[in-house]
Amino acid sequence: MVKHYLKVCLKMTSAHVVVQLFSLALGPLVFYIILGSRTGWYIMSAALSVAYAIWVYSTAYKIAGKDIKSYSQHKAYIAKGLVIAVPTLLITLILTLLYDFSFYHQFTDYDMQMRFEFIVRNVFMGWNFSFEGFRSAADGTVRMLYWVLCYAMMPVFSFLGYWAGMNRYEFGYNFFSKLVYKTPAKTDKENKSLK
């Protein structure tokens, strides 16, 4: 049972990491022309936040789809959609505390402080890059919307996706799953049988 929870939590954390890496790699390239303005960062973060929501929803939907099978020993329950987001939220909380610590703690060794700040701030920004456009300034002050997105997107959309998968609601799943998961191409035999 614990092994199953660790496995599905790892899937959700992997979904978070994949979207952030995708956002970090392609987001600035796609939106390079408009990133010179603050509005450009908002547009990029809004688009990447939608992609993040779709990916998390689809992953949770797929997990629930496996849990509701009659032969599965893992039973689906509605709160599992929230539980599977907990490890990702804990990592986000730890990185947030380290990020805050890097701004307000002074080391005796200046080089050590600079290395620590560089590593912590870049890891934190990479971990939450999809929402980076909603962060206020480089001086450490951060808008409330940024924190809401960092801490609410994963549990809300994993809950909705798991709930929809548990009840077999296909609201947008066929569309979203084509964006997230590779679907096998139909063979000529299948195409002829459909006609």
Put a short name on every predicted segment.
Residues 1-63:
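Transmembrane alpha-helical insertion/packing segments
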Residues 40-50, 79-83, 121, 143-152:
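Alpha-helical transmembrane segments of polytopic membrane proteins
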Residues 54-80, 84, 101:
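Membrane-helix interface/capping segments
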Residues 55-62, 141-174:
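Transmembrane alpha-helical segments in integral membrane proteins
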Residues 79-120:
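Hydrophobic alpha-helical membrane-insertion segments
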Residues 118-157:
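Hydrophobic alpha-helical transmembrane segments
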Residues 168-195:
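Short, highly charged, low-complexity non-transmembrane loops/tails of multi-pass membrane proteins
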